[in-house]
Amino acid sequence: MLKHHLTAPLIAAFALTASAAGARDNLQIAGSSTVLPYATIVAEAFGENFEFPTPVVEGGGSGAGRKKLCEGLGEATIDIANSSSRIKQSDIDLCNANGVTDLMEVRIGFDGIVFASDINGPDFALTPTDVFGALSAQVAKDGALMANAAKTWADVNAALPAQDILAFIPGTKHGTREVFDVKVLEAGCKETGAYDLFLAGSSGADDAAKEKDAVAACHATRTDGMSVDIDGDYTETLSRIAANASAIGVFGLSFYENNTDKLKVATMNGIAPSVESISKGEYPVSRPLYFYVKKAHIGVIPGLKEYVSFFVSDDMAGPGGALADYGLVPDPELAATQAAVEAETVMAPLK
């Protein structure tokens, strides 16, 4: 028996895809490379412990996953999008345009964004101001904006190593990049006074437009080869560092913790990233992790509700659960998430 009332368009969508490709009995999941290892662990455990096939979990980035989720309804579309940043209004608008109107937002826990370099390299004690000063396209100097001319980290902060600046950062399709932009670049931009200069120089029609211009300028990175966008996953960033021992890369905490034999992590504002420092709110560059579920697929794609419930169970996402062993910081409000999943609660409009 179906658990969800189907509209005529949805029935047609499933009928069409079923006749074209046969009934699909495994879950299809895509999105965040940060959430990918957690989702893979859950998917494998789900396949071993339930009477359903192991879900198919792919990466591709948070933005790409949300876009795929919003392509429409039916067996030819994915069921879940993993995301290391919260869904955007533009995603919701795309979903609505394609008939995907009821999404369940599931917060699974927290993760940290870390800066790490070759294990044999020097120690780095960074601040958002340092990172902005090293990687931004423009910096503030003597009350004016100028093109970033820093060549070494010591040029930015004399206390840092006199090592050439080379940073591998997530590309714009990754949810990690959104958090990096806001919590590192934008924070450093404001601390240095560059934000105020960008704001004063904006030709925006109103205050909101000027603020948007200033934020965009804060997020703009240099294009001279010292800040390199990585569109692949963290393994690509790791391989770049292996080939460039003087480089720094941006990773998720869990990936770093699985590669401590190759990487040395930097502190941020004097705090080393760890499950403990993130759970206490001490480490400044952390973020919640999510996945988004098409409610209309529950009761149609076998095992979807069961997978979602299993993912947020105490055994998986709780303190001492399987995912905590791999670096996921448990959500103190996990019980509320579990209740929302059980009730199949759809997300409220974004504020």
What are these regions (language model features)?
Residues M1-G22:
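Gram-negative bacterial Sec-dependent N-terminal signal peptides
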Residues R24-K351:
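Flexible loop/hinge segments at secondary-structure junctions
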